[in-house]
């Protein structure tokens, strides 16, 4: 909850801005908690982007995007909330490479189609991330 405390102090008495929260690994736990807390304070969440938040339930009334270093992490994490769009590295990469070298990570962008099926498109993590922020 340190994130939320920081935001409360920074924006005390001001109009609360819309936030895009980017989180990595164990930080995803604090990020999803802060996102919910921010909304309870009257703020808006534009998106939450979770890099390798394995085992963290991600549910919200705002866009959530999961990024995983391999297919197993992608699949097993999706049981706790898929999010709107997701990406997994294929071939698998080291956990830290997601953060360190997104331009070198190749994998699959996964989105739900209008008929509820998954669409898989190959791209780099950098391309996927740029699409999210566009």
Report the location of each language-model feature.
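Serine-dependent carboxylesterase/thioesterase catalytic core
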Residues: 2-86
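Active-site catalytic motif of lipid deacylating hydrolases and related acyltransferases
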Residues: 1-16, 67-75, 81-134
């Amino acid at each position: 909850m340190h994130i939320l405390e920081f935001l409360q102090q920074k924006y005390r008495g001001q109009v609360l801005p819309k936030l895009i929260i980017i989180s990595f690994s164990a930080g995803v736990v604090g990020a999803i908690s802060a996102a919910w807390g921010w909304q309870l304070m009257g703020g808006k969440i534009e998106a939450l982007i979770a890099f390798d938040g394995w085992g963290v339930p991600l549910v919200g009334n705002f866009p959530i995007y999961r990024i995983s270093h391999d297919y197993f992490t992608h699949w097993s994490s999706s049981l706790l909330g898929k999010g709107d769009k997701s990406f997994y590295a294929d071939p698998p990469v080291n956990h830290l490479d997601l953060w360190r070298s997104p331009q070198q990570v190749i994998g699959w962008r996964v989105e739900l189609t209008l008929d509820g099926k998954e669409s898989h498109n190959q791209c780099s993590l950098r391309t996927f991330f740029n699409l999210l922020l566009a």
